[in-house]
A protein has these predicted regions:
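Active-site beta-strand/loop architecture of penicillin-binding DD-peptidases
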Residues: 5-104
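Short, gly/Ser/Thr-rich active-site loops of penicillin-recognizing serine hydrolases
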Residues: 87-131
Length: 131
């Protein structure tokens, strides 16, 4: 299993097709892919008659952090063509998750107080709720 995790890490962080998903400070691992549309040639001909441009579906699955993952995200981008486009969507979701986690940890640390070795959270103030 570790070989698979290492390979997925490389896809994102070592110049692989998932490089657009890389995030500084977060070990995101992932895999790009495409899914061929059924009868793509026939569909393209039909789409061209209607002024549409059909491409293969693109997907990306990613998880973070590399060790002890907390989040898994899959993005499927209809007619995206290549998985790199879906990788940027996953990157943004993972970044939002860790940004929010950091804000919550900071907020809780600011509210905590310790009495006799026991940690308590003070009730939030109106000011602290606006952050």
């Amino acid at each position: 299993m570790q070989d698979v995790v290492d390979a997925m890490y490389g896809v994102v962080n070592e110049g692989g097709t998932g490089a657009p998903a890389a995030l500084p400070g977060i070990e995101l691992c992932g895999k790009t892919g495409t899914a061929q549309l059924a009868s793509l040639d026939k569909s393209k001909a039909e789409a061209a008659r209607h002024g549409m441009n059909l491409k293969e579906n693109a997907w990306f699955v990613g998880f973070a952090p590399r060790r002890d993952p907390e989040i898994v995200v899959v993005a499927l981008f209809d007619h995206g063509g290549v998985g790199q486009y879906a990788a940027t969507i996953v990157r943004d979701v993972v970044k939002s998750y860790f940004d929010k986690k950091t804000r919550l940890q900071t907020w809780n640390q600011e509210r905590s107080t310790t009495v006799a070795g026991i940690s308590f959270l003070r009730p939030p103030t109106a000011e602290s709720r606006t952050r």
